[in-house]
Amino acid sequence: MDYFTEYKLSKYKEIEPLSDKGTTVLVYDTVERELLVKKVVNAEIYKIYKKINDIECDYMPKIIDTIKVEDEYIIIEEFIKGDSVDYLVKQKGAFSEEKAVSYIIDIGEALKQIHSRNIVHRDVTPNNVIIDKNDRAILLDLDIARIEYKNESRDTTLLGTAGFASPEQYGFAETDTRGDIFSMGMLLNFMLTGEVVQKKIYTKTGLYNVISKAIQIDPEKRYRRIEEFIIDVSAYCPEKIVTEKNSKLLYKIAYHLPGFRTNKIYKKIIAIILYFAFLWDIYNTIFYREVSFKE
């Protein structure tokens, strides 16, 4: 292990395991002073994280670092504080249509980014979606994801969560992005009913048709792309979605400005002071030029 890699690993102090196997651990970054998640993954999953580590999306954890130490592959990612959809539904009951659609659109935004890199998530489930303090749905866990290969006839590794995994994940065909659309239909139904489709399917509004199309056994009969699914879902809650997206516009712009990217309060305060001083200087320069011109 070289000195730089050793230094990077040394700054992450392990707090507690987040999985039974101990491969996912809550850590504290002693330099940035923030909680993060450390994962030990296999070589294939490491490749997937490398493919998405430059994605900036509000609805999935930010990849902080990818570290290879001999035969060990380590991912450091943002820690998302909140409750899972599974927990919330079991504790408080099914969501309203407005709430469910809002969350599904958030998750859809994350999947759009993932699918754009030819990656299939394969585990879109209530346990892998966290509702954060800003009431956003965050999609977690790429630990059984796969890169989409067009020439394969079926998945070589059978993985997934019963009740949400597509038939393809059980070896009937190759899993592509339509497998995630199947899971999204199952997830939407769970949010609205509190049950898996096999026990109860949502029938109150036209969302029944959206869910039914998404969860077709034959992938050819499903939505072809996640964008198509989201468009149909959005039709049942358009006003709220438009309002939310407009309200997030300034936040998204600010997120890309220096001082706001890490979401640390002290950095935001310093940035605001500096930006104000900069704008004040510009104002004074323009004002004095106008005065001089008039004289």
Walk through the language-model features, giving the residues of each.
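Conserved catalytic-loop aspartate of Hanks-type protein kinases
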Residues: D180
